[in-house]
Amino acid sequence: MARRTAPSKARPARTRKAALPSPEARRIVVLSRNPNLYSTRRLAEAAKKRGHLLRIVDTLACGIMVEPGRPALIHMGEELKDIDVVIPRIGASITGYGLAVVAQLEGMGIPVLNGSRAIAQSRDKLRGLQVLAQHGIAVPRTVMARDQTDVKDAIRRVGGLPVIVKLTQGTQGIGVMIAHSMKEISSILDTMWDLGQEIILQEFIAESKSSDVRILVVGDRAVGAMRRTARKGEFRSNIHRGGEGERYYPTKEYEECAVGAARALGLQVAGIDLLESASGPKVVEANSSPGFEGLEGATGLDIAGLIVEHAARIARAPTRA
């Protein structure tokens, strides 16, 4: 009688570590909810062209494992490993969880381009302006309005009507309004406060003529710039609001202002928006996940390649089998 052999236990398949094609190659992860977004696709193309291995990971598909001495990120049932550097592309709608994921990566000792603290500071318009002002960076006069009793004094302090009204959270020109009268301001503020929003009032810089300058900073360099002009009947110059962009060659003053703003906020990649005032450039916003389709189109520059090259420079040296 033949002896029965016990069925062998199936061993879980091991994920093979992807071989790096050269000593200079790096394993790059881009945190992005949508792999088809222009900026995400361009980063993937630029990494491939330079011989790096790039993986796109959905931020919201990451699980956070908190354990003393062994922090981990879980993705599709497995711990994320063998990462040399991460480029976070965190959308405004998922800022809270996105910051937690980036902070977890920092706790794992993985270089990130940008860090959680830098992203958090730049996402809050008031906090960002506070940091910039503390570092001597020129910004528009700004007051936070808490209730209607503060409004008249706030308007006086920022230079009078018209005045810019902004939500402290918001991107792509969303939540930015202009008010020409007390009636307009009162109506806007009451509506926003009823919705639980926090509001800042900001001086209107007439000489900017419904245009601004976007300078992209990578590392410690201003690598590209464009002037954005609002479409007719609109004062917001954001490309997402229908503004038009054209290549701009910034002066040394503008470059130093943009690089200084990024450095003050701790951003290694930043879209710095500046208004041209009579007293010189003033920073109105810093974007920690700047889109660059408009900038590449206006300038012909390989912005994605510059970002990937900087990511590779700050990456940790990979372990090799």
What name fits each language-model region?
Residues 1-23:
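Polybasic, lysine-enriched low-complexity intrinsically disordered terminal tails
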Residues 2, 22-48, 54, 65, ...:
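Active-site nucleotide/adenylate-binding loops and adjacent lid/helix of ATP-dependent enzymes
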Residues 3-4, 263, 276-321:
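C-terminal active-site "lid" helix and adjoining low-complexity regulatory extension at the edge
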Residues 23, 176-265:
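Phosphate-binding site of ATP-dependent enzymes
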Residues 60-82, 92-98:
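Glycine-rich, highly charged phosphate/nucleotide-binding loops
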Residues 87-88, 202:
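Redox-cofactor binding/interface segments in oxidoreductases and associated redox assembly factors
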Residues 91-93, 168-170, 289:
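Short glycine-rich anion-binding loops that position phosphate/pyrophosphate groups of nucleotides
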Residues 163, 223-224, 270, 282-284:
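Protein kinase-like catalytic core scaffold
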